[in-house]
């Protein structure tokens, strides 16, 4: 169930990164050009109006409709950012996927080690009788996660003393 959630989260993150790369381009504002209402620029020659041409329309200026003539202008207050290329989007996506895979591998290794240690501790506890004087200290060391460290060391020292019945009295000083 956890892997299904992780897969959904990964898909959501990758989708977000791809959408951000696709729509993260700087915005351009289109504004219509101003129409010529009698004021012509200084570079265009003015036609002199003669009495013969007064009744005919002036064809020296080609006036196009405003709706078809559009110019792309960028606002002065906004900064121009370079548009993300497909290489940068792929690099970011690849980095995210690789980091997600590394995190998953670390979590799986930790879970496998914890489960294997629990299985070994349970197997050792079932196979060995804790009442036997010759039992090893391995089964006691598995229960250190419960916070019984002091009693475990005393039990293991007791087992050492019972194994070495005529042995050394200095075993108690080692604690």
From Swiss-Prot:
Residues 133-145 have a biased composition (Polar residues). It is found in: Cell membrane; Cytoplasm. InterPro entries: ECSCR. Residues 113-175 are cytoplasmic. It is a single-pass type I membrane protein. One of its GO terms (cellular component) is cytosol. Regulates endothelial chemotaxis and tube formation. Has a role in angiogenesis and apoptosis via modulation of the actin cytoskeleton and facilitation of proteasomal degradation of the apoptosis inhibitors BIRC3/IAP1 and BIRC2/IAP2. GO terms for biological process: angiogenesis; apoptotic process; cell differentiation; chemotaxis; negative regulation of angiogenesis; positive regulation of endothelial cell apoptotic process; positive regulation of proteasomal protein catabolic process. Interacts with FLNA. Interacts with the 20S proteasome subunit PSMA7. Keywords: Angiogenesis, Apoptosis, Cell membrane, Chemotaxis, Cytoplasm, Developmental protein, Differentiation, Glycoprotein, Membrane, Phosphoprotein, Signal, Transmembrane, Transmembrane helix. Residues 25-91 are extracellular. Belongs to the ECSCR family. Residues 33-66, 124-145 are annotated as: Disordered. Its main location: membrane. Residues 34-60 have a biased composition (Low complexity). Residues 1-24 form the signal peptide. The gene is ECSCR. The modification Phosphoserine is found at residue 165. This is Endothelial cell-specific chemotaxis regulator. May be heavily O-glycosylated. The chain crosses the membrane at residues 92-112.
